[in-house]
Amino acid sequence: MKYFKNIIFWNKLHPDEQKKILSRPILKENNFIKKTVKEIIENVRLFGNSALKKYTFLFDKQDINTFQVSKEKISSSSFYLSKVLKDSISVAQKNITCFHKAQIPSKIDVETEVGVRCEQIYLPLNSIGIYIPGGTAPLFSTVLMLAIPAKISGCKKIILCSPPPISNEVLYAAHICGIHDIYQVGGAQAIAALALGTETVPKVDKIFGPGNAYVTEAKLQVSSIFNGTEIDMLAGPSELLIIADNTANPDFIAADLLSQAEHGVSSQVILLTPCFELAEKVVLSINKQLNNLSRLSEILKTLKNSSVIIVKNLSECIEISNMYAPEHLIIQTQSPREVLNYISNASSIFLGLWSPESAGDYASGTNHVLPTYGKSITNSSLGLCDFQKRVLVQELTAKGLMKLSNTIEILSSAEKLQAHKNAVKIRVDFLKGKI
């Protein structure tokens, strides 16, 4: 059966049509969601745990009296998982730890002038919240992606929230990462609890993690409150762009496109290639592989937003890719690193035949929390720096201040900031014995 046959010739399209092809599925503003989330946040602020209990029963159909998961339940989660799964989680943990430890920044300590010492130091965030969605497929891999850099950074308090009942996979992943403050609360109410605090759930300084439209809206709203909780990013639907030439494997490409298409209705996958024969083989392979996949309805909805695009050459592939700024970029060409040199916008890049996007999702070591919706033009993938803050330190000796004093006084006078000038002058006068 032919589920997909959307091959497009880029240079036969009008510029407006080209723009439309690269447009993401529209994320419609939903006033009902905005209003509902605002009400949930306000009720959590006013009524704390009572509001959490009410919403947990309403949305999750769970009657929860104790939100915090006991340490016994967390540690016993190991007994419910197979050795094969636990060993695989350990491999992923090792690789993610290795890559993120390599991101530990070095302190900067320089003397810009004689007697003028400037430093940049890195301090961990005091408290962070991790949100892990529930559902039929618990995202325990995201626990690793968030908890491991938080621990390496030295965050003092790490709180995890997830809708009840929390899966043993999520509890186990949290346990091996050293997270023991876990609360069975989900949705917008969990984000509100982390941002505001309740009798049980502690308030945190920054919230990390994906979620549905309600969770995303809640993150947006709590981060907009004056002096409110910070957030990692507003994650959008998953997206993948592949650049391929005639050396690529069409079955591999089809499998990669489908791996992202199964994320859901608003996801988008695109293949760019100068090779029509390859494009035809990819389309055939997509239709063949679809017969063996379980999430067929989700994939078919995604494929309606997706395209196989024929272009003139690899240079045009690169130009279009940089314009699109994908979340995930796979380069399957004869010389992928040569193409990499010309890529300016992408969140996570996968080179060559043997680098499926799934590797980055789970176990290569890189983080899978990534900017979407073209945000890779200015934003970066999640990393150690998101769990830290840069602090600047300066120390001047008397000699150093004397040397800079004239410069500072002239500059502050030019900006008509007399008090700034005086803060230097009063010290200089003291050193000259005028006070």
From Swiss-Prot:
Q: What is its EC number?
A: 1.1.1.23
The record's keywords, sorted A to Z, are: Amino-acid biosynthesis, Histidine biosynthesis, Metal-binding, NAD, Oxidoreductase, Zinc
Which pathway is it part of?
Amino-acid biosynthesis; L-histidine biosynthesis; L-histidine from 5-phospho-alpha-D-ribose 1-diphosphate: step 9/9
What is the cofactor note?
Binds 1 zinc ion per subunit.
Annotated NAD(+) binding sites: 131, 189, 212
Look up the domain of life of the source: Bacteria
Q: Which cofactor does it need?
A: Zn(2+)
Q: Which GO annotations describe the biological process of this protein? A: L-histidine biosynthetic process
What SUPFAM superfamilies does the entry give? ALDH-like (SSF53720)
Active site as annotated: 327-328
> Which residues are involved in binding substrate?
238, 260, 263, 328, 361, 415, 420
- Does Zinc show up as a keyword for this record? yes
> Which InterPro entries does this chain map to?
Ald_DH/histidinol_DH, Histidinol_DH_CS, Histidinol_DH_monofunct, Hstdl_DH
Q: Name one GO molecular function term.
A: histidinol dehydrogenase activity
Quaternary form?
Homodimer.
NCBIfam families, A to Z: hisD
Q: Which family does it belong to?
A: Belongs to the histidinol dehydrogenase family.
Q: What does this protein do?
A: Catalyzes the sequential NAD-dependent oxidations of L-histidinol to L-histidinaldehyde and then to L-histidine.
> Per its record, how is this protein called by name?
Histidinol dehydrogenase
Q: Which organism is it from?
A: Buchnera aphidicola subsp. Acyrthosiphon pisum (strain APS) (Acyrthosiphon pisum symbiotic bacterium)
Top-level taxonomy: Bacteria, Pseudomonadati, Pseudomonadota, Gammaproteobacteria, Enterobacterales
